[in-house]
Amino acid sequence: TTACCNFCPCTRSIPPQCRCTDIGETCHSACKTCLCTKSIPPQCHCADITNFCYPKCN
């Protein structure tokens, strides 16, 4: 999947610290730290902290 994120809160610091809080069955392709529950289907979110947000998903 292309890296995209609908919910991406950022801190007001410079540089900002942003985290994608979308939850889905997988994480986006650029995610380095993907955390998933053991449920079926799994609920995964990306734990990476970046200084930007990816474009919104369609």
Curated annotation (Swiss-Prot):
InterPro entries: Bowman-Birk_prot_inh, Prot_inh_BBI
Expression induction or repression: By wounding.
Cellular component, GO annotation: extracellular region
Keywords, in A-Z order: Disulfide bond, Protease inhibitor, Serine protease inhibitor
Gene Ontology molecular function terms on file: serine-type endopeptidase inhibitor activity
Pfam family, one: Bowman-Birk_leg
Disulphides: C4-C57, C5-C20, C8-C53, C10-C18, C27-C34, C31-C46, C36-C44
Annotated site residues (Reactive bond for trypsin) in this chain: R12, S13, K38, S39
Family the entry assigns: Belongs to the Bowman-Birk serine protease inhibitor family.
Name under which the protein is recorded: Bowman-Birk type wound-induced trypsin inhibitor
Protein source organism: Medicago sativa
